[in-house]
Amino acid sequence: MSKEAERAELHKTIWRIANDLRGSVDGWDFKSYVLGMLFYRFISENLTAYLNEQERQAGNPEFDYAKLNAKEAAYGLAETVNEKGFFIFPADLFANVRARARHDPNLNETLARVFTTIEASAKGAASEDDFKGLFDDLDVNSNKLGPTVARRNERLVKLLDAVGDLNLGSYTDHTIDAFGDAY
C-alpha cells in the first residue's frame, strides 16, 4: 500500500471513529482514545512479532505467542521485560481482547485491568518511567463514553474494531508515522 493510500485509510478510520463517538467525547479526549488504542495495538503486535521471531529462530516455526496460556507465557516474563521493557499476557493482547470484546459485558473493566497490568509489568525495569501512567488519559470508565456501562462498552467495541481494522503494515516497513498522522 502506498504512503498516500495508508494516510487516506488512517484519516478515513479516524473520521469513522469520530462519528461513532460524536456528542460524547470532545476533541482532546478523542485523541487520547484513538492514540491510546493505536499504541495498545502497536505494542501488542510488536511484542507478538518479536516473541514469534525468537521462537522461530530457536527452531519452533509453528509457535504463536497469541495462543499460549498464561502459565506458558509467564515462563519468559522476566526475560521479555528485560528485552522489551514491558510484558503482555497472550489473553491481554489487543487482537485477543478485540476478539472477545463484543461478548464481554465487562469490557471496560477488562481494558482497565489490561492497561494497569502492562504498566505494572515495567515496574522495576529501566522502562518503568516510560510506562508509568501511559494509559491514564484513556479512561474506559468515563461517562463521556456513555451513561451506562453497556453504552460505554458499545463505543469501546467500535473503537477496538476501528483501530483493529487499520492496515498498519509491518513494523519494519512503515511508510507513514501512524501516531504522528493520527495526532
Model regions and ranges:
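Non-catalytic, mostly N-terminal accessory regions of nucleic-acid modification and defense proteins
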Residues: 1-183
